[in-house]
Every structure is written in C-alpha cells, then in structure tokens.
C-alpha cells in the first residue's frame, strides 16, 4: 500500500516542479483516497478498512488538492485494492 501511495507523491512532486501549487504531502494523498472511497456505494473489506482508518484522521481536513496524474494514481490504487 505504501509503495503505491509513494508513487502518487512522486507524481505530485513532479507536477509541483512543473508549476502546480501543491508540493504534495501524505495527508493530501490520504485525503484524496478518502474522497474517492466516499463515491463508492459498495466497498470490499479492504476498502472498508481503509475508509475507516482514514476517517479517524482529523488532520486530513488540512489537505490540499492533488494534480490530475497523482489523483489518477490514487484512484487506481483505491479501485484495485483487495
């Protein structure tokens, strides 16, 4: 799990080098994962566990939006989570 989210952080930092306003922090990636999970009506057990873990983190309210490539990487991670 950490490896896929690290990949999203690398994509975000590349976007920052190209002019995006957000450097990228782990809470940004976690907040994006939680936002994606909120769109699902039916979650598998792994997705349910991740959603519960992320909902407990109060610091996610300070997260900033990710670049599109990083959002796509997080979305791919969440959808393929088993």
UniProtKB/Swiss-Prot annotation:
Family recorded in the similarity comment: Belongs to the T4likevirus lysis inhibition accessory protein rIII family.
Give the consequence of mutating residue 42 to R.
Answer: In r67; r-type (rapid lysis) plaque morphology
Q: What is this protein called?
A: Lysis inhibition accessory protein
Q: Where along the sequence does the record put site: Interaction with holin?
A: 42
An example of a GO molecular function for this protein is: molecular sequestering activity
Listed InterPro entries: Linr3
- Stated role: Probably binds to the cytoplasmic part of the holin during lysis inhibition and stabilizes the holin-antiholin complex thereby resulting in a robust block of the hole formation.
The subunit structure is: Homooligomer. Interacts with holin (via N-terminus).
């Amino acid at each position: 799990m950490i490896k896929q989210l690290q990949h999203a952080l690398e994509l975000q930092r590349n976007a920052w080098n190209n002019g995006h306003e957000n450097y990228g922090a782990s809470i940004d990636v976690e907040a994006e994962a939680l936002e994606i999970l909120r769109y699902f009506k039916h979650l598998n057990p792994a997705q349910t566990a991740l959603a519960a873990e992320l909902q407990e983190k109060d610091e996610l309210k300070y997260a900033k939006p990710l670049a599109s490539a990083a959002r796509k990487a997080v979305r791919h991670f969440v959808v393929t989570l088993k």
